[in-house]
Amino acid sequence: MPKIKTVRGAAKRFKKTASGGFKRKHANLRHILTKKSTKRKRHLRPKGMVSKGDLGLVIACLPYA
């Protein structure tokens, strides 16, 4: 049976944690930042976790993570 390919875009976006979850970066922090408040940008800065509902999709994209 052939190996399962990793989705390369997902491999660049998600990192697996020791407890089995996945870290991710928040959206809306790339451009057009002048109209966004400092508070909003500050809250988007730390890494988020992939929610339980999306976890299966991420695991399917990263079979060897």
Curated annotation (Swiss-Prot):
* Nucleotide-binding keyword on record: no
Can the keyword DNA-binding be found in this entry's annotation? Answer: no
Biological processes per GO annotation: translation
Signal peptide annotation: none
Q: Which keywords belong to this entry?
A: Ribonucleoprotein, Ribosomal protein
One family name in Pfam for this protein: Ribosomal_L35p
Record family assignment: Belongs to the bacterial ribosomal protein bL35 family.
Spell out the protein name for this chain.
Large ribosomal subunit protein bL35
Organism for this UniProt entry: Erwinia tasmaniensis (strain DSM 17950 / CFBP 7177 / CIP 109463 / NCPPB 4357 / Et1/99)
